[in-house]
Amino acid sequence: MAEHNEIGKIGENITKEFLVKQGFKILGQNYAIKQGEIDIIAEKDSTLYFVEVKSIKVRDCTNIENLVISPEDNLTLAKWSKLLITVETYLKHKNVPHETRYQIDLACVYIDTEMRQGRVKLLHNIYKEKE
């Protein structure tokens, strides 16, 4: 497995643990269609959360404020478009009622592989920011 794929999987696992500790119920992971993939699908307080995970390797995950690159930089317009299509497909495929509240969040994961730890910064409801 390529290192970036391995970092991505580690980031998804760290994010799942983070979400569970925050009271989320994990409904699924890596829901994929031809057009794209949703990394994590979760639920909390009657709201569905579609969580896109972007991870980067850092030397020190406790000091992320002055980094030149951040995980959210990896959410390109093309990836964003595919994510929106995949979310809409999921809602239809799973017959989710129209009145169900949902949002798309971005989990930015900073991974220190040497210290074997990570840090999650969760950006809420990025759909409004990207519209």
Predicted ranges, named:
Residues D39-A42, C108-Y110:
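Conserved protein-kinase catalytic-loop segment immediately C-terminal to the catalytic Asp
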Residues L19, I40-N66, L83:
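Conserved catalytic cores of phosphodiester-cleaving nucleases, focusing on short active-site segments
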Residues Y31-I33:
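Mixed-charge, glycine-accented linear interaction segment located at domain edges/termini
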Residues A2, E6, I10, Q35, ...:
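Residues at secondary-structure transition points
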Residues L67-Y102:
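Mid-chain, well-packed structural core segment of small domains
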Residues M1-Q29:
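Acidic-basic catalytic patches of nuclease active cores, encompassing PD-(D/E)XK
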Residues K92-E131:
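Domain-level recognition of nuclease-like catalytic cores that cleave nucleotide substrates
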